[in-house]
A protein has these predicted regions:
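Short amphipathic alpha-helical segments, especially helix-boundary/capping motifs
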Residues: 1, 13-19, 46, 69-73, ...
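Structural signal for hydrophobic packing residues in well-ordered secondary-structure cores
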Residues: 12, 44-48, 74, 96, ...
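Flexible, acidic/Gly-rich N-terminal and inter-domain linker regions that tether
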Residues: 1-69
Length: 213
């Protein structure tokens, strides 16, 4: 009998069609977790080897305001909180240069999603900086880091449309996207993603599709 590991290694999972989805779904629900772990490990090692690499990053929270209100989030600050803010270009550069001193190669821009679409405070703060949208400001901060430092920007900006992705692609080394769940149930009243427009699964999936996953 052919092993589960062999079946997986005979297929390129990144070129999967509907029939293969059904095939793997059947295997998942009819195999033990140990076999699945063994199969996944075997496939990983075959294609990527056993070397783990890393790149030192400095974390730069460009804004800790967000229009989403995920109940588990400890990063976001409500605009009424005195600690809620948008970092200035000077603060970004100061953090970047501190990262250089520590031997960092990348700068990780993390930020809440589109706070200006919900609250007045981030809207006013962006206007003071000369911007209407957080993604436009983020794009220019990536340019600033590239022009003034040796660091490579990495962006975690959440849901983006194709236009925003193209803009950011030109000024950052990589972009991250968290697909926490594909469950619509979690967006219902009482769920952790209730009243969080950017956590509706289809919105995040559309970003991945636009990025050319």
């Amino acid at each position: 009998m052919t092993s589960l590991s062999t079946h997986l290694n005979d297929r390129k999972l990144w070129k999967i069609d509907k029939d293969e989805v059904a095939y793997y779904r059947h295997m998942v629900f009819n195999s033990s977790i140990e076999k699945l772990i063994d199969a996944a490990s075997s496939k990983r090692d075959k294609h990527w080897g056993n070397v783990i690499s890393y790149s030192r990053k400095i974390f730069v929270p460009l804004t800790n305001m967000c229009r989403d209100t995920c109940s588990y989030c400890t990063f976001v600050k409500h605009p009424d909180d005195p600690d809620a803010k948008i970092m200035s270009p000077q603060e970004v550069l100061l953090s970047a240069r501190e990262g250089e001193k520590k031997g960092c190669k990348e700068l990780l821009f993390s930020l809440g999603e589109k706070p200006e679409k919900r609250y007045a405070k981030p809207t006013r703060a962006l206007e003071t900086l000369g911007y209407e949208a957080m993604t436009d400001y983020l794009t220019d901060m990536c340019k600033l880091v590239i022009e003034k430092t040796s660091l490579l920007p990495h962006v975690n900006a959440g849901t983006l449309n194709e236009y925003e992705i193209v803009k950011l692609k030109n000024v950052c080394a990589s972009m991250g996207m968290m697909l926490e769940t594909t469950s619509k149930r979690l967006t219902q009243k009482g769920g952790p993603h209730y009243a969080c427009p950017d956590k509706v699964p289809i919105q995040r999936i559309r970003t991945l599709i636009s990025a050319g996953y």
